[in-house]
Amino acid sequence: MTQTQPVGTLRLTIDDQGPQGQSRAVEQFHQGALRVIRPHYLDDSGQVCYTIIAIGGGYLGGDVYEQQFTIKDNAKALITTQSATKIYRTPQGPATQHTEINVGENAVLEYLADQTIAYREATYHQFTKVALHPSATFVMSEQITPGWHPDGKHFAYDEMRLHTEITDSTTGRLVLLDNLLLRPDSREGSFGWTEQYTHSGQMIVMGEGVDKQLVAELNEQLAAHPDVYGAVNFLSAPGTLLRGFIARTLSNRTEELINLHEHIASLLRGRWRGQEPVNLRKY
């Protein structure tokens, strides 16, 4: 991780040795502007749910945040946020978040964050490194929303960079290296970039249940969606059994992207583990 003193640090290690096989945190550390709410269980599957709170109110220029999540063999966790992550003006340099994730054998992590709102003259760099056992299930969704501007301008932020690496923890094999870079001022208009849309999203899913038939099914659902434009692509790599998909989505409303991502997460948890749909009970 970074050598700069972080504004907020959070570490969670989760195993499956709680009462009646429930997953639980065996290591929990927080410092500075990051906290977690007391864990709760959304159903009787034993999956533990943690909610992250950023108590500073928003990310500022030069801020660095660090997160580390370890899900041990057979454990199941859902990690979410209490509210949107807000990136304000960053004249001192980019706001940065580093996240390291390790998901063990037959373990599950659903990382379903609220939207990231980038305001005028904001630069945000996010680096996420994920190591997965081939039998693990990993779901991550993100939404990027342009913040309010007094002139009504939609894309007033300077830069958003979301860098994601996924590797096979048993072989070290790289499965995904994704670098989503949004620089509105480098584009003349929206044609060929976001077209008429203002909000963007991405969802990454890795799991043994992913195949090309599932990807085709999700693409059909996306094509029929009246308010979201996007595509789903299959992920695999030689030298590893890991496989998954990445979905890129565009819309004009944050809620449409969040609802779509939660629909996909609910569809997969029902098929793969017989769990109820996602219900984060935030509002």
UniProtKB/Swiss-Prot annotation:
The keyword Chaperone applies. Keywords: Chaperone, Cytoplasm, Nickel insertion. InterPro entries: UreD. The keyword Ubl conjugation does not apply. Residues 1-21 are annotated as: Disordered. It comes from the Bacteria. GO terms for cellular component: cytoplasm. Induction: By urea and nitrogen starvation. It is found in: Cytoplasm. Pfam families: UreD. Disruption phenotype: Cells are urease negative and are no longer able to transport urea. GO terms for molecular function: nickel cation binding. UreD, UreF and UreG form a complex that acts as a GTP-hydrolysis-dependent molecular chaperone, activating the urease apoprotein by helping to assemble the nickel containing metallocenter of UreC. The UreE protein probably delivers the nickel. Probably acts in the maturation of urease via the functional incorporation of the urease nickel metallocenter. Required for urease expression. Belongs to the UreD family. This is Urease accessory protein UreD. It comes from Corynebacterium glutamicum (strain ATCC 13032 / DSM 20300 / JCM 1318 / BCRC 11384 / CCUG 27702 / LMG 3730 / NBRC 12168 / NCIMB 10025 / NRRL B-2784 / 534). The lineage of its organism: Bacteria, Bacillati, Actinomycetota, Actinomycetes, Mycobacteriales. The gene is ureD1.
